[in-house]
Amino acid sequence: MNKQRGTYSEVSLAQDPKRQQRKLKGNKSSISGTKQEIFQVELNLQNASSDHQGNDKTYHCKGLLPPPERLTAEVLGIICIVLMATVLKTIVLIPCIGVLEQNNFSLNRRMQKACDCGHCPEEWITYSNSCYYIGKERRTWEEGVCWPVLQRTLICFL
């Protein structure tokens, strides 16, 4: 829209408005009436269609970013928000992890002191801090009941 020209005219008529006619500057027809306001704009739009098709860098809204720059700004904004969330999460979680590690270490120590059981003898199986023996020898029932007492253990009936 390179060439724009506007003409503003106000027509005030005398007491007999039906008879008065006045020609406006730049207008070839006469107008009659009590009071009329006329706004004439002549636009020279010779290159208007070619301006919109060929010139993609001209934007009429100055407050908005063009699509490629806007997309880039949105992506960078999202990346910034994700990075800030990660940093904040790290700042909050690092002290918590340290406290949990200390608690875990002290709990393991207390369990080792409370359990204070030695290793199981050879051919015995450890399960849940207990030792189990599965014998392959043939014994009578009385021998099978007496054998754990001799070993200072308890018998488990299955």
Curated annotation (Swiss-Prot):
Changing Q151R: In allele NKG2-F*02, allele NKG2-F*03, allele NKG2-F*04 and allele NKG2-F*05. Residues 1-74 are cytoplasmic. Its main location: membrane. GO terms for molecular function: transmembrane signaling receptor activity. InterPro entries: C-type_lectin-like/link_sf (IPR016186), CTDL_fold (IPR016187), NKG2/CD94_NK_receptors (IPR050919). Residues 1-30 are annotated as: Disordered. Residues 1-12 have a biased composition (Polar residues). Changing R70K: In allele NKG2-F*02, allele NKG2-F*04 and allele NKG2-F*05. Natural killer cells. It is found in: Membrane. GO terms for cellular component: external side of plasma membrane. The keyword Transmembrane applies. This is NKG2-F type II integral membrane protein. It comes from Pan troglodytes (Chimpanzee). The lineage of its organism: Eukaryota, Metazoa, Chordata, Craniata, Vertebrata.
